[in-house]
């Protein structure tokens, strides 16, 4: 029987079970992640975050993310902020800005004295092969809008990879958007070979949007950091939002602040909070 210490955290209600694999032995491939994610019979969370040491010179930590269904993903923005807060609170680093290795590249979270965390999320990708996405409507590479073929018709989406794949849909009223219905159709769609996160974006002004996200392997969540980044990038490319300005992204769980200038890195700022400490036994 194995005993494991963990911390429950959240970023705007997007909640995580965070495991320190620096100070204790833990192999996620051997863990019953889906059972732990169960909100009635387990710890309950959207994603499991594993904090490890990196073997790459100049990199402080390795960051692994597992969805509630046990599948591993390459990036999670809200998780990145919680990761940074966790390693600081646990005394694993005394740096204000850390270098973190993920499955899809390196990120640079920075902690502020006011409790907010800013993360350089890197450059967005748009080519269908980078999403990945399979166009079926004759669109060229790097198009701002692609068509997803549903039984009800063709759904226009903007495709952005922010370390994980996103399809962004512009809606008039996010409160009335068919997030679960349409999200559950697009998330596993054949045109997205690795499945996709589906964002529903309402543009409020040139520097403000409202957003709901149906996450891959999870369903709708209270907040999605990479989803907020993808939505702002898509809005700028579509001419709906101002480039180089800080855009306020209001999600069900709270507000994130995203900034992007074309060709540059995406910057995300938001809170990260610990909820409780726990310990469990598993075989």
Curated annotation (Swiss-Prot):
Its EC number is 5.1.1.7. Substrate binds at residues 14, 47, 67, 77-78, 164, 197, 215-216, 225-226. One of its GO terms (biological process) is lysine biosynthetic process via diaminopimelate. Pfam families: DAP_epimerase. GO terms for cellular component: cytosol. Keywords: Amino-acid biosynthesis, Cytoplasm, Isomerase, Lysine biosynthesis. Pathway: Amino-acid biosynthesis; L-lysine biosynthesis via DAP pathway; DL-2,6-diaminopimelate from LL-2,6-diaminopimelate: step 1/1. Its main location: cytoplasm. The active site is at 76 (proton donor), 224 (proton acceptor). It is found in: Cytoplasm. The record marks 166, 215 as: Could be important to modulate the pK values of the two catalytic cysteine residues. SUPFAM superfamilies: Diaminopimelate epimerase-like (SSF54506). NCBIfam families: DapF. Belongs to the diaminopimelate epimerase family. This is Diaminopimelate epimerase.
